[in-house]
């Protein structure tokens, strides 16, 4: 439904180019999350490595069927913690800095259709599922991760529990034998659930997507204090016991809109109490529209989310299904996330996962290409994820070429890393290697082209911070070629990263912010020449190249214009732009205040041209605001745009 807004905008005359001292500018707190520079390895403990066969005897163990426990556990994932081992030390060797594990809590009893090997059917949230190990095993896992300087991210569920509640003519009940099936005790109280039937056809008052049972699982009333405070107590203890650095929150779009506003501050306080000052929470909100997705961050106050729009766009580009302009269009939405507390660089990016399927399978299904293109296109997708904005996450097994059989999604995307007993997985095709047969995937890791490439990409990020989620500017996006400039503020050096999804080499002239010193190739085999700030490069087919300038950025001139603001009817926010022209990679910070003597409030910082932020009318309803924007170039010079005034009517 469209809403009418009244907008009154007054701007001053165009300000001449000038460096200014801006002592009155308020300090802007960093919006970067604690994982902002990390590389995440996402893994199913049950499918990684069996380190303790004594826990294979519990009900639900059936390594020949895809829907049951297969024997992997915390001991297997931990390993010996020594170099050359296949546990955490192997993950560290691949270049990852954080490990995200599926939920470890005790699962409901297995059914004839499967067991909770994936961790999303929890009933006892205070203990480790015995199939995966014990609390002592979890302590050892955490200690090994700390020794290897690996951060731990735990997948958690707050929307629902395992399926214990039944219905009789729309009346919910718990059978006597399951009356105390859940832990802690408040989870056994029917009053803490919505009890309105399936999400697809619920009978309650409210949106079924939030109050209905997710695939038959018991939907909690996450709007109730007993629930959000109870979950805060539960998951705070996991942080305190094991020193976790982050949570991935499953089904985050299905909880109450205000849940994270109540829950997250308690989680962050618990983390700080044990010395973790920048705990990261990212939610699973399966929506490929960035306009929808950003509202979960800006209005619902999820710290950050998994970037489903990036997944779709990156895979389509890597497959050759779409061209570079589509990637450019995606990044144009990044300003929607910008605020004083959020930024698109905090989004957790990925190419495939345990639900939709693996990246190679998705690339294969997007467009008919020659069989020998699948490997380079898979590498291209990973390079785009590693070197553009966001926090990359790689799904376990992708590094050894796992693809998937049939549709390749859900159960069929959760293969064993150890020697499998599932028949279809023994003969399943792989990208970059042969079917695994009776062997295991650890033996082929060091020689696998994807694993080797990921190590190279990780090494480049580690040696060159500009490549690791730093400032980014799109320099060229046409047909099959996308070229980005990257910059780390501390270094002041410009990098060019070019991605070619075409089967032919592409030549282009790229205008940069560096006019002297030439360029050094860090990745790939490009043909490069430079004249002043224009770099002429030829990027080989289906490849990524990285160039580093030999001298610091020197094209730092800035021309400032005016601030404009008008309603963006697609998002419902006020798009507020700063007219700034420069070849440099700048920082533009926007501010507002509602009275002449009031404090300046940060609206966020944009580091990618064109420079803009989006003002949420719900935050400033019926207020007259004075707007201000400052610009900082690579040499540290500051500029200020003329102030503007805006009045926002009630939504």
Question: Where in this protein do the model-derived segments appear?
Answer:
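Signal that preferentially marks extracellular ectodomain short beta-strand elements
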Residues: 82-91, 442, 510, 610-620
